Structure formats: structure tokens, C-alpha cells
Amino acid sequence: MNTRRELPESPYLAAAAGRKPHRVPVWMMRQAGRSLPEYRELRAKNTMMQACFDADLITEITLQPVRRHGVDAAILFSDIVVPLRAAGIDLDIVPDVGPVIAHPIRTAADVATVSPLRRETVAPVATAIGQLTAALGDVALIGFAGAPFTLASYLIEGGPSRNHERTKAMMLGETETWNALMAALTDVTIEFLRVQLDAGVDAIQVFDSWAGTLSLADYRAYVLPHSARVFEALAGYGVPMTHFGVGTAELLGAMSEAVSGHGVPAVVGVDWRTSLTDAAARVRPGCALQGNLDPVVLLAGWPVVERAVRAVVEDGRRAVDAGATGHVFNLGHGVLPATDPAIITDAVALVHQL
């Protein structure tokens, strides 16, 4: 069932689709999170996993930065490993550590234990989306999921990793096992995003947080086909699709291949290490760009923030002149917990003025 809203005034959807927005659209990754006192108050009473599987908490946390900052898009509050939990993986999110997998996936026999995502386990997510689309007015709602490679890294390493050595060793040395795992995780990602799209999200973003650890050749050989299958499977919903990774300057062209060419608006996220103008030259024609203020800038005081925000907006305009179909202002990664919420509010207001 398609319950998609019509949001002709959304600057986010306009920029993503290559239309001229009435103002530069802005939202920030991890805008719903530890930078907000209201979020910290809720989380003091609930674990991360509890929050991610409670419809009312998902709704409230997703709405908090919209109320406070006036951003142009809300991103569904969740965690990258939620679909793994919904597929039966025994895991927890440990404070100050991150996701921890009870039984890491290391062998072909382990891969065979990865089950399809069970829709009923993420019913609270769908319920929350219904509540959010009723509450958000003209503000777009972005659904999200982790890309298969990043999910695979968590499963193989057993948690966050600096070098992803076990992941890359399986990828390079046990390619049949690797491809079986990636195929299973691609199915999980597709199904989790289908749940969100069927419930009414206005756009989706796929996070490949750890893809920057790969060479371009390895990304193309072992990751790109699986990521492309995610976007191809979901293109029929007709919503803008964004592909984002960290440290992916050399991969931007390949990542744009995964997300574009499917007949729907395609957006490529850019981190702060690459200018938007350079990114415009690297991605496929027909892609919009999203980014790319360094999150640390928001800790450096308003004069620094103001200069940097103006610079990103100007770089975005140059990128559009250079061929990008649009620009969505964002950070190059997530809001840091120590960020002053008032600075974020002021930065959003400044973007809207420029």
C-alpha cells in the first residue's frame, strides 16, 4: 500500500529531485540524538534498543529536532543494526561502545543462520511512521537503513572496528561465503526499507558508514553489486534515494552508480574531506549532492560556524553550476554529542537566509 504524501513545498524533496527549492534545504545526520537535552532525558529511562522498538519513542525522538531547529527533513530515529535484530541476530548496543554481536558471523555455517527480516518485529517502526507523517506537516520524513557492507562488518567483527580486518579477509579470501552473507544482508536491508516505504516515508537514505575502508577496485568487485540491488529493488516507490558513506572520496563515482540510473531522484552524500564542487565532477550526471559541513565546526564558536556555513552553501551553488542537480545542506557525518543545540538552531536559520 502506497500512503505517500504530496509535499510540493518541501525544499528537501525539490532539491533532491533536481527542482529549484524556495530555500536551501537543511537537515543534519544524528540531529535526533545526544546533543539534545530532551533526547537525553528520554534515553535516561530507556535503552537504545527499547527506544528503537517503541513507536511512541521513535515518534517523539524523530520530532524533537524538527521542533527545536526548524530543519527541512526529519530522519526516522533508529539504529543501523535494528534490521539485524529484526532478522534474529543476538546483539545489543552497549553505551560508549556501540553494537556488540553475541555470536559473530565468521564461517559459511554462520552465514546460513542469518534469517530474513520478520516484518512483525518492526511493526512499531511502521506505526511510528504513520504517526510522524500525520505530525510533520510539510516536513519530509526520511527512512534509513545501513548498507549491506556496513552491516556485514558489524556481524563479522562482532562490533565496531578500526581496520575491519576480519571483514576484508573474508571478502578477499572467502569470496563465496562473503557473497552469500552480502546477498542475505541485501535482502534484509531491502525488506526493512520496504517496511518504511510502505508505511509512508518520503525519501530513503542508505548509510555505508564503513565503505571508506575499501579501495575503489574492491568496492566495485565486492560491494557495489549488492548496494545497487538495494536501490534497484526500491526504485519503484518513486522517492528520492540517498547513498552516503564516510571517507569515500575515491568511491563517490561508484557509489553514485549504485544509487542512480533507476529512474528516480538520486542523491550522493559527501563528507567534509571532499568539496562539493569536486564531488560534482566525480558523481554520475543526474545526481544531487548532500553535505558537507565538518561536525567539529559546530564546536568552534559562532564566528567559525557562520563562515563555514556560508562556505558550504557557496560550494553547493558552485557544485550545481558544475552539474549537480541540487544541493541539500547537511553535515559530513553526524552531530557530535557535545554540540550546543543553540548553535545548530542558528546554523539552520542561517542556511535558510542564504
Curated annotation (Swiss-Prot):
Residues annotated as binding substrate: R30, Q31, A32, G33, R34, D79, Y154, S209, H333
Subcellular localization(s) per the UniProt record: Cytoplasm
Reactions the enzyme catalyzes: uroporphyrinogen III + 4 H(+) = coproporphyrinogen III + 4 CO2
Keywords: Cytoplasm, Decarboxylase, Lyase, Porphyrin biosynthesis
The keyword Cytoplasm is annotated on this UniProt entry: yes
Pathway per the UniProt entry: Porphyrin-containing compound metabolism; protoporphyrin-IX biosynthesis; coproporphyrinogen-III from 5-aminolevulinate: step 4/4
Top-level division of the source organism's lineage: Bacteria
E.C. designation(s): 4.1.1.37
Gene3D superfamilies linked: 3.20.20.210
One Pfam family hit: URO-D
GO biological process, one term: protoporphyrinogen IX biosynthetic process
Residues annotated as site: Transition state stabilizer: D79
GO cellular component, one term: cytosol
GO molecular function: uroporphyrinogen decarboxylase activity
Family as reported in the entry's similarity comment: Belongs to the uroporphyrinogen decarboxylase family.
Function: Catalyzes the decarboxylation of four acetate groups of uroporphyrinogen-III to yield coproporphyrinogen-III.
HAMAP family linked to this entry: URO_D (MF_00218)
Name the record gives this protein: Uroporphyrinogen decarboxylase
Gene name for this UniProt entry: hemE
